[in-house]
Amino acid sequence: MVEAKIKALRDELERHNYNYYVLSAPTISDFEFDKMMKELQELEAAHPEFADPDSPTRRVGSDLSKEFEQVVHKYPMLSLGNTYSEDEIRDFYDRTVRSLNEPFEIVAELKYDGTSISLTYEKGRLTRAVTRGDGTRGDDVTANIKTIRSVPLRLRGSDFPEEFEIRGEVLLPWAEFDRLNKEREEQEEPLFANPRNAASGTLKQQNPAIVASRKLDAYFYYLLGENLPAEGHYENLQAARAWGFKIPDVIRKCQSLQDIFDYIAYWDVERKNLPVATDGIVLKVNSLRQQRNLGFTSKSPRWAIAYKFQAERAETRLNSVSFQVGRTGTVTPVANLEPVLLAGTVVKRASLHNADIIEGLDLHIGDQVYVEKGGEIIPKIVGVNVEARSMLMGDKVRFIRVCPECGTPLVRPEGEAAHYCPNESGCPPQIKGRIEHFVTRKAMNINIGPETVEDLYNAGYVKDSADLYTLTVADLLRLERWAEKSAQNLMSSLEESKQVPFERVLFGLGIRFVGETVAKRLVSAFHSIEALEQASLEDLVAVDEIGERIAQSVLSYFSDEKNRTLVNRLKEQGLRMAVSEEQLANRSEKLKGLTIVISGTFSKHSRDEYKAMIEQHGGKNSGSVSGKTDYILAGENMGPAKLEKAAKLGVKIINEDAFLNMLE
């Protein structure tokens, strides 16, 4: 009875996974899905004799991998020959005509810009996932791949081969890339340069739980093995779609060279509207027999070629390199350029990321450099026009050894790309940066900006965030541009900030890796600053979404006596360092598992108040309507786009009264 129930839950959850992640057509809410998942987890925990490595519960990525085993590819993962030239596409087509001397079809596909993967299935079950590596051998990343919801652990139907491989691309969607970089920016971690690097780095994470949290996707494009269902590559992909694989629906058969050029021209424009990064078109001879006849060179197949889209690039002069220090001490090199037009905007600066990038480019001041804007959020230098160098070559660019602001020797933690200034208490940009972070709207919401922080710091009035609360009107009036009214306004703003809830105070402290969401998780678990200070590593990592890196950062922060003193001074000034009795009493799980979008203007409460209520009762706020949305809380003047999307997806729209009734 129990075994049958477990099997039924597994089958149903896999069906819903397929509907959501492959078909993009969910049939149940996240709440219902999570409820089923929890039931299955509890049954599996109570009955380990029915364990199954392919269970949907394994997708959450709970196992910690110590290392990746090297695996030899059964079929080498060769690179494709590539070109940026339509003339070379024409040459490829003409060579194929001459070599085959019979009719043939070309299959045109988008070239996805991620990290390549090869999956092995035996009797319909995923048994191994291996990265490209050097083409001959790669890393076994099966545990990480199993966390990707669009990868089938068991195949649908029964007409698949006994054993086969399928090749594909692991991708980080643009929306997830933006979310991840925003989170890293808030925590002053180095940003991912593009979704490809982010996907590759994620897949190599030692902890599958981190992989699961980043919402990777996977598209598949080639099958290998004995007894494939068809003699055509295109037809095999359609069969794989029926087995549960995510096969792009933009694949086309081309009967002529003009068909190919039309496909390239269309997607060179339209690819910008896709949810994932692409960097070209792949062309393959459709017939597997003809592929075998054409064969391979030592490096690539003769029956396929990749056409690469031109990246948006410009050439300009490198005038200088400056180094910026962030609030957590991260030192970032920035190239200062002769202004140049690129992708419709004038570019004056470009990212150099870290010391390894600088060394790899072998930059010299005065070099003519190539600046590119592809999938990146800011322009980057991708190369140097060495031929343009004169005999009077400028100084070689080297990463600095000491902090440009305070002169402290920089450190580079083992395994990290970034350099840091360790002088947290004496480095001006770090001090001012922490204060600027503390006063932001999402933290303490104190009505001053960077210029005022700069003035207060230079005048000697403020050396840390606690000093803000000892300011007087007389202090402010001694500064330029300050009058009685503006000084009183700041005093009022400081007083009002003492009512800011604990999670925002914790976020405002600027602990490395503790963003808004992490701060809320910690406050929900520990309720007071004292409890958080006394928490052990084991206590911290037991909190949902808190990994060892965040836990170590929290422990490091509170082990520093200066930080504990700062917290005590803020507490003495009246800031909230604990969840109030009222907040604890009002918490519930009435909205647990529900995702709610707020739209429009309201009369009974503000939007921020409604957001707080949703979180207080266990719900989740979202800024956009999707298949995961359970309700839209709608006020006056709700956006027409959200209204249209809600109608299309069948999302229920509720007003203020209906929402408040849900909380009673």
From Swiss-Prot:
<feature type="binding site">
    <location>
        <position position="403"/>
    </location>
    <ligand>
        <name>Zn(2+)</name>
    </ligand>
</feature>
<feature type="active site" description="N6-AMP-lysine intermediate">
    <location>
        <position position="111"/>
    </location>
</feature>
<keyword id="KW-0234">DNA repair</keyword>
<feature type="binding site">
    <location>
        <position position="284"/>
    </location>
    <ligand>
        <name>NAD(+)</name>
    </ligand>
</feature>
<dbReference type="InterPro" id="IPR013840">
    <property type="entry name" value="DNAligase_N"/>
</dbReference>
<dbReference type="InterPro" id="IPR001679">
    <property type="entry name" value="DNA_ligase"/>
</dbReference>
<dbReference type="InterPro" id="IPR033136">
    <property type="entry name" value="DNA_ligase_CS"/>
</dbReference>
<keyword id="KW-0227">DNA damage</keyword>
<comment type="function">
    <text>DNA ligase that catalyzes the formation of phosphodiester linkages between 5'-phosphoryl and 3'-hydroxyl groups in double-stranded DNA using NAD as a coenzyme and as the energy source for the reaction. It is essential for DNA replication and repair of damaged DNA.</text>
</comment>
<feature type="binding site">
    <location>
        <position position="109"/>
    </location>
    <ligand>
        <name>NAD(+)</name>
    </ligand>
</feature>
<feature type="binding site">
    <location>
        <begin position="79"/>
        <end position="80"/>
    </location>
    <ligand>
        <name>NAD(+)</name>
    </ligand>
</feature>
<protein>
    <recommendedName>
        <fullName>DNA ligase</fullName>
        <ecNumber>6.5.1.2</ecNumber>
    </recommendedName>
</protein>
<dbReference type="GO" id="GO:0003911">
    <property type="term" value="F:DNA ligase (NAD+) activity"/>
</dbReference>
<dbReference type="InterPro" id="IPR041663">
    <property type="entry name" value="DisA/LigA_HHH"/>
</dbReference>
<feature type="binding site">
    <location>
        <position position="132"/>
    </location>
    <ligand>
        <name>NAD(+)</name>
    </ligand>
</feature>
<dbReference type="Pfam" id="PF01653">
    <property type="entry name" value="DNA_ligase_aden"/>
</dbReference>
<dbReference type="Pfam" id="PF22745">
    <property type="entry name" value="Nlig-Ia"/>
</dbReference>
<dbReference type="Pfam" id="PF03119">
    <property type="entry name" value="DNA_ligase_ZBD"/>
</dbReference>
<keyword id="KW-0460">Magnesium</keyword>
<dbReference type="GO" id="GO:0006281">
    <property type="term" value="P:DNA repair"/>
</dbReference>
<feature type="binding site">
    <location>
        <position position="427"/>
    </location>
    <ligand>
        <name>Zn(2+)</name>
    </ligand>
</feature>
<dbReference type="InterPro" id="IPR012340">
    <property type="entry name" value="NA-bd_OB-fold"/>
</dbReference>
<feature type="binding site">
    <location>
        <position position="169"/>
    </location>
    <ligand>
        <name>NAD(+)</name>
    </ligand>
</feature>
<feature type="binding site">
    <location>
        <position position="308"/>
    </location>
    <ligand>
        <name>NAD(+)</name>
    </ligand>
</feature>
<dbReference type="Pfam" id="PF00533">
    <property type="entry name" value="BRCT"/>
</dbReference>
<dbReference type="Pfam" id="PF03120">
    <property type="entry name" value="DNA_ligase_OB"/>
</dbReference>
<dbReference type="Pfam" id="PF14520">
    <property type="entry name" value="HHH_5"/>
</dbReference>
<dbReference type="InterPro" id="IPR010994">
    <property type="entry name" value="RuvA_2-like"/>
</dbReference>
<dbReference type="GO" id="GO:0006260">
    <property type="term" value="P:DNA replication"/>
</dbReference>
<keyword id="KW-0862">Zinc</keyword>
<dbReference type="InterPro" id="IPR036420">
    <property type="entry name" value="BRCT_dom_sf"/>
</dbReference>
<dbReference type="GO" id="GO:0005829">
    <property type="term" value="C:cytosol"/>
</dbReference>
<dbReference type="InterPro" id="IPR001357">
    <property type="entry name" value="BRCT_dom"/>
</dbReference>
<comment type="similarity">
    <text>Belongs to the NAD-dependent DNA ligase family. LigA subfamily.</text>
</comment>
<dbReference type="InterPro" id="IPR004149">
    <property type="entry name" value="Znf_DNAligase_C4"/>
</dbReference>
<keyword id="KW-0520">NAD</keyword>
<dbReference type="Pfam" id="PF12826">
    <property type="entry name" value="HHH_2"/>
</dbReference>
<feature type="domain" description="BRCT">
    <location>
        <begin position="586"/>
        <end position="664"/>
    </location>
</feature>
<keyword id="KW-0479">Metal-binding</keyword>
<feature type="binding site">
    <location>
        <position position="421"/>
    </location>
    <ligand>
        <name>Zn(2+)</name>
    </ligand>
</feature>
<feature type="binding site">
    <location>
        <position position="406"/>
    </location>
    <ligand>
        <name>Zn(2+)</name>
    </ligand>
</feature>
<dbReference type="GO" id="GO:0046872">
    <property type="term" value="F:metal ion binding"/>
</dbReference>
